[in-house]
């Protein structure tokens, strides 16, 4: 099963990705990152550095200002970022 982190998890596209993943059996959202930490079926953090869950990929629909932090995290974890 593919474990996903969604950045921008509470935005419009984040909600679309959450909905798509919820209807699948081969992947799951393990964490989200968003300035709005509104409750979800998974933990949502304000920064990528706070995420403790193991994941296989980051799907990014966040603000471009967060790109440097996302690239640093992705490289440190050897995790694809799309």
Residue ranges and their predicted role:
Residues 6-18:
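N-terminal Rossmann NAD(P)H-binding glycine-rich loop of SDR-like oxidoreductase domains
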Residues 22-42:
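NAD(P)-binding Rossmann-fold cofactor-contacting core
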Residues 43-54:
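Short amphipathic alpha-helix with an adjacent loop that forms part of the alpha/beta core around
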Residues 58-74:
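Beta-loop-alpha module in the N-terminal Rossmann-like domain of NAD(P)-dependent dehydrogenases
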Residues 72-82:
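ADP-ribose/adenylate-binding Rossmann-like module
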